From Swiss-Prot:
Recorded catalytic activity of this chain's protein: beta-D-fructose 1,6-bisphosphate = D-glyceraldehyde 3-phosphate + dihydroxyacetone phosphate; beta-D-fructose 1-phosphate = D-glyceraldehyde + dihydroxyacetone phosphate
Purpose: Catalyzes the aldol cleavage of fructose 1,6-biphosphate to form two triosephosphates dihydroxyacetone phosphate and D-glyceraldehyde 3-phosphate in glycolysis as well as the reverse stereospecific aldol addition reaction in gluconeogenesis. In fructolysis, metabolizes fructose 1-phosphate derived from the phosphorylation of dietary fructose by fructokinase into dihydroxyacetone phosphate and D-glyceraldehyde.
Keyword Nuclease: no
Protein name as catalogued: Fructose-bisphosphate aldolase B
Binding-site positions, beta-D-fructose 1,6-bisphosphate: 43, 272-274, 304
Site (Necessary for preference for fructose 1,6-bisphosphate over fructose 1-phosphate): 364
GO molecular function: ATPase binding; cytoskeletal protein binding; fructose binding; fructose-1-phosphate aldolase activity; fructose-bisphosphate aldolase activity; identical protein binding; molecular adaptor activity; phosphatidylcholine binding
UniProt KW Phosphoprotein keyword: yes
Length: 364
């Protein structure tokens, strides 16, 4: 027999709901700047910049110190632990710079994947041990939301029922712990684009994954109005020979979400999944314009698809500050427009914005 557990007070629920709504108000999205040291190193290597703490700090300072108008397009920023405690060149904490712009500060909380025994090289996510204590400390340090990424892949045998259930339950436990500590949980069940599967198969798998996630969230008494969902857009595998239009991607994506995601969820903040900057924007715009019911706000939580052009413009040189910040602002504004179905592709995008950002078995 089911029993009610008053896990959250009305005041806690109100705070969580208000934070979630503030992040995605008026087409705003999220900058995912939570890359680990290793992942950031891979990106710096591509522009021939050494992976040092100072170089990582310098690039992120360029992103966070843009004009205050960025707050019209970006409502939240996800930070890595290192970045949360870093300062700009004047000695001001990055998190305080963001807050002064009216941007909500978030933190990456998962600690990467671990092999899931009894499966074909599938994984579960680490980080639940000590999570409550970490959340409590982050809340004291000015953080208002968290992110937890679970990864599933498509192949002949994957994802297995075991992997789906294990990752769904880990996401739900994380979400419950976050809310107990005043953090809005971003729930991120990512189905990787690796493989040669078609769009229809991706939709089938994604519906199974999302249904399991929301069953688990319900089992763990998670307050849906105080959460955000960060799913992949539904696309064919990177090696699939058949190509699909943004409108086809949009129809499959919204259909799957409509079948599985409760209307109580405030917003769906899509990840870019290795698409080029321009494709991520075009697909988001098409999803908004899809002629199907959408009870949730549509938004974005992009990392590579907001930073690729900026990183290329920077090249590790302080003299490129203006070009770097302009490139970042351009993508932020474009995605804010797309989240409201107002983006118009002009065909004038730079080379960096049209380059695929796909990385096999991508990890943060």
């Amino acid at each position: 027999m089911a029993h009610r557990f008053p896990a959250l007070t009305s005041e806690q629920k109100k705070e969580l709901s208000e934070i979630a709504q503030r992040i995605v108000a008026n087409g705003k999205g999220i900058l995912a700047a939570d890359e680990s040291v290793g992942t950031m190193g891979n990106r710096l290597q591509r522009i021939k910049v050494e992976n040092t703490e100072e170089n990582r700090r310098q690039f992120r300072e360029l992103l966070f110190s843009v004009d205050n108008s960025i707050s019209q397009s970006i409502g939240g920023v996800i930070l890595f632990h290192e970045t949360l405690y870093q300062k700009d060149s004047q000695g001001k904490l990055f998190r305080n710079i963001l807050k002064e712009k009216g941007i909500v500060v978030g933190i990456k909380l998962d600690q990467g994947g671990a092999p899931l025994a009894g499966t074909n090289k599938e994984t579960t996510i680490q980080g639940l041990d000590g999570l409550s204590e970490r959340c409590a400390q982050y809340k004291k340090d000015g953080v208002d939301f968290g992110k937890w990424r679970a990864v599933l892949r498509i192949s002949d045998q994957c994802p297995s029922s075991l992997a789906i259930q294990e990752n769904a339950n880990a996401l739900a436990r994380y979400a419950s712990i976050c809310q107990q500590n005043g953090l809005v949980p971003i729930v991120e069940p990512e189905v990787l684009p690796d493989g040669d599967h078609d769009l229809e198969h991706c939709q089938y798998v994604s519906e199974k994954v999302l249904a399991a996630v929301y069953k688990a969230l319900n089992d763990h008494h998670v307050y849906l109005e105080g959460t955000l969902l960060k799913p992949n857009m539904l696309t064919a595998g990177h090696a699939c020979t058949k190509k699909y239009t943004p409108e086809q991607v949009a129809m499959a994506t919204v259909t799957a979400l409509h079948r599985t995601v409760p209307a109580a969820v405030p917003s769906i903040c899509f990840l870019s999944g290795g698409m080029s900057e321009e494709d991520a924007t075009l697909n988001l715009n098409a999803i908004y314009r899809c002629p199907l019911p959408r009870p949730w706000k549509l938004s974005f939580s992009y990392g590579r698809a907001l930073q690729a052009s900026a990183l290329a413009a920077w090249g590790g040189k302080a003299a490129n500050k203006k070009a770097t910040q302009e490139a970042f602002m351009k993508r932020a504004v474009a995605n804010c427009q797309a989240a409201q179905g107002q983006y118009v592709h002009t065909g004038s995008s730079g080379a960096a914005s049209t380059q695929s950002l796909f990385t096999a078995s991508y990890t943060y």
